[in-house]
Each structure stands twice: as C-alpha cells, then as structure tokens.
Amino acid sequence: EQMNAARALFAEDSCVYTLRQLKKHLTQKLAWSRGAANAGALALMEEGPVVSVRHETYYRGQKAEPVLVEYRDEALTDADGKSEPACLQKALPGDLYEAFRGPDRFVVNRFVRHTKLRWLVRLQEHAEGFYTMVTENAYEPIFFRVPDVQKPRPQSNTVYEIEVDEAAEKAGDPLADYEDYVMENWERYGYRNFTWPARIVRRVARADDPLGALRIAEERHGSRTVFPDEVKDEAKDVPQEVTASQRRGRVDLRDVPFVTIDGEDARDFDDAVYCEKSGDGWRLLVAIADVSQYVKPDHPLDREAQARGTSVYFPTAVIPMLPEALSNGICSLNPNVDRLTMVCDALLDAEGKPTAYQFDPAVLCSHARRTYTQVWSALSGEDAGFEALGERLFEVERLYELYKVLHAAREKRFALDFESSEIKARIDEEKGTIDRFEPYRITDANRLIEECMLVANVAAADFVLRNERLTLFRVHDKPEEERLQDLRRILRAYKLKLRENSPAGFAALLESVKKSPSTSPLQIAVLRTMSRALYSPDNIGHYGLQYGHYAHFTSPIRRYPDLLLHRTIKAILAKRTYHPKLYSESGIEGFHALKLGFRPAFEKPVKELSKTARDHEVWRRLGLLCSIAERRADDASRDVMNWLACEWLSKRPNERYASTVVNVLD
C-alpha cells in the first residue's frame, strides 16, 4: 500500500531525483519515517524508471522529459522562464543545453550549441607570457586566449573582434596544464571558469581616442554604421523635389503658415505646427514628414530602417536610421520648399481636451525654421527674440497660449513631470574631443512643441483603436512593488514620503522633491522607480503620461515604430489593413531581449502559427525589435558620453568639482 502511494506521487511528476532527493521527497510528501523512506527510495530506484546523467543515476518522474535551457548570468532558464542557479565550468552566455528538471535545479544532460561565437574583447598580456582577452560586449566576464602564432603585438586599450575556435574546443584543450594553472590562480588573475580558445578576426579600434571610443560603442551595441550599397542606390534614386503627380489626392496646406521649431544643431525637421482659435477652443495642425511615401515595404530602404530601428545620437556624430538624402533631404520639412506630410488636424476645447480630429495626407511648405532659443527669447520679451521670429511672432504667441492650456490639462491628469536639465558637451571639431560642458535648459519653447506632439500621438493611437487595427502602441506600465520599496527606503533618508502609489501620489512627491536641496538625485531615484516604456501591439496605456492610449506618430525619420504607424493610418484611410513584415529576428537577442522576456531559442517560428496569431506575433516581435533598438541606442550614447567625460576629466587632475553621488553601480 505504501509503495502504491509512492508510485501515485510520481505519476504526474516532471522531475528527476537522486537517491538522497528521493528519500527527502518521500519524507516530506508522504510523512514516511526515515527508515521507510530509505527502503521506499531504494525500491523505486530498483523498479524505475531511471535515467543516467553524467555517471549518476536519477529516478525519473513519469512526466519527466528533457527540456532546452539557456545559460546566462550563472543560471539556467527554460522556455517557461523558470530560472535556477547553475555553475558551469565551461559555458558562454547564451549557450543551450538539454536538461531534466530537478526538485531544486536543472540537471544538465548534454550541450546543444553556442548561440554566439563572436565577441569584442580587449587584449591583455600577463607577466607569465600568456595573453587573455576580456569581453566588451557581454554583461559578465569571459576570458579568451589566442594561439601563439596569432598573438598581435600587445596594445593596451585596443579592442578586437574574436571568434571562439570550436574545432580546438571540441578537440580538447591542447594546454590542459595551462587551464589547470589558470583555475588554480583565478583569484590572482581575475579568471573564472573556462578560458576559451579563440582566433582574432579583426582589430576594431583603440579605446583611448575619441573616434575609437565611438567605433567601439557602435560595435558593442550592434549599431549599423554603413548603409549597404543597395540602400545607397535606392536613396540616390529618390527624387529631391515634390512632383505634381505626388501632390495629387493630397490636402493642399501650402498657404497655412506652418513653422518648425527645433534645436540649433538639428538637421532633420520631421514636424511642423500651426494653431488658430476655433470658437472657445483651438484648432491644432501637426504636420509630420510622410516618410512612408519614399520608404516602401520590402524595399532595401525599409529593410535597413527596420534593422536599425532608430537613429543613434552621439555627442560627436549621428548614426541615422535613413540615408541623408531622405533624413536631411526630401523628408525634412525645410523652409520654403514643398514637402509631403501626414497631418493630424485636431479640434480642442477651452480646457485642451480633443473633441475631434482627422488624419490627411497633405502637401505643405514650411514658412519658417526657428529654434527653441529664439522662441523662448521672444516669449521672454527680449528684442533679439522678436527680431528672430519676425512675422512669425503672432503664430508662435498663439501656440504659447495653447501650450498653457495643454500644460494645465497635463497637471490635472497628474502626468509625471520631471524638472528637465541636461548637460551638453561642446565638441572641439578638429580633435573630436570635448571642449567644455554646458548646462542646457529645457524651456517652455521645448515643452510647447512636446505638448503639440502629444496631442497628435494620442489622436493617432485613438484612430487605430477605433478602427480595430493592430499597430505598435507606446506603453508604460505602473511601477513594480519591489522598486517602490527601494524608493521608500531612499525617501526616508531625506524625510520624504510617497503617500500613495498613484499618479497623484507621485505628482505630490515630485513637487516636494523640487523644494529639496537634493533635487537631482531624488528625481533620478524616482525616475529609476518607473518601468521603462516600450512598444507593443497590446495597449495598456501610458502610466507616466496618464493616457489610456498612446503611440509614436511624430518622428518617422528617426523611429521605425512611427513609420509603421503612418502605414497603418494610411491603410485605414484607404479602407485596407496593413500587414507588416519582420525581415529578420537577429536584432531580438542579447541582454535587452532577455529583460523583455524574449528567448529566441524557445520562440516558435512565426510561419508555424495560424494566420490570426501570426499577424499579432509579427507586431509583437516588431515591438520587441524596436524597444531593443531604442535601449541599445541609449546604451551606446551613454557609453560614448561617459568615455568623453572621463577623458575630459583625466586632463584636469588637479581641479576639484562639487558633485553628488546619484547611484552605486558596483
């Protein structure tokens, strides 16, 4: 009877057990005595089923089957996201293994394959005469060595691309005693685990010069710096003037005095605005460059734009999503030339609430290009600003009146509002190094344009939802409880409180923070509490902006999700449904993919899904692709800025600066 109870216990079990684990399981689950558990475990092992894994015998639950697991960050994770600690002496991040589930860990049965063989590394020479290479593009340390015949002349701060030598790995390490030496002395030299045989593919750059730092950041985060020839050829063929046939069927808004307002160093102008009074409320027109007119699905330009996902901005350079012929040319709303646009024409009531809107393909001619500095100077009553705006002053003043209404509406809905102050690096163009740092103040001129863009973005999301179509929404989830607890601990040190976990609670907290002498670190702490916004076809609203629906419509020159949204809207206007293509999933990988819950090895191929599921899954994976591209771009920009700042400080060893610690990284 007891053995029948034991067999029934394991009838639905999907784990494997050692003899010791089997005894413990019987004791805990069936309340057997130690003696009975010992006898029962031995009997079960005798009758089976059992499986032998690496010279050890395991009792196999009736539902126990091998599963695919991925190794990363000293843990193994299966397709369901279950993760267990693992210490493998010989494993690269992303390696796949076949394993059985155990009661407290995965039992590795066999190695399946590496998912990544090429790495960026810095070469290091040791006094004992051997070389190692430490990775630049992994989030945990890995060590490589190269054959004697290939060892380059050691160059400190030089980054190389290397490839794991699978043949040498499979043949066994010819330097077995070398590995033993490393393992015995890992504490002395910083080694851990296996030192991989590898070959040098190419030298990337030196890390101690500005162009090298930029190149390394591009490589480390997968930025595509050179456009393929087929993309360049297609860009060359794009006409640089709007033709009569292209104007046909579009709303003609060339007489409307649109203006573009951007930063002084902006080169691509993808939005223009105009507003006028309408009864007690307002009419706002937001015109956005119609990139979809020139970037067609399944063409080289579109394939490359999707692979890039976004433009990447560095202090010294820009890696554009689209070639310059489009981004700074025919798609840029330069003044006094005709341009094709998608226009959001919105009516707002006296409190700034949208009452109606429509989207139209249009042609316009920007009447002026002005800068944030010029606009703010005029709005502040300065003569220089009045002179710079000229005859456009009246339109800008009207926009400012509307901004005040929209800003008041923002405060009423408790949208999060962080005091924005940025530090701009001024670059010595000849040397490519930082000449100085300057504070860059965000003024109402910047916020004016931002609020206009928000109106268009919300209307675009609403338009898609009302027409029951799929697109990529910009979604932002509420903060996680664990992060809230961390924030509360920080606030206690400053005698501050988050009185309630709600938009109103955060709005009140941010007002208190603004009055604190420690405004900057506290704002950073609040910001880090927030979830990161991302792109998804599943609308959950935007917590930070306090919108029930939101999407990115206003920057198709530099963001691929905006281009997808334009195509969706155009298809709706034409009474069609837009079905995008996912050209490659190679960008949905790495650290950020894992953080977003996507594990390529465990994902079902899109082509194997039903038509309905396939459409949604393509949108989902496009959202992941674009979210990851955005985060990689942020990482790359931050890397270069940090390097330039450190390089600037290294030239000033005797200078002192007042500073505040805002985060501990390690």
Indicate where each model-derived feature is located.
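Residue-level signal for secondary-structure boundary elements
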Residues: 14, 18, 49-52, 172, ...
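Feature marking long nucleic-acid-engaging regions of large polymerase/nuclease enzymes
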Residues: 84, 168, 262-481, 489-496, ...
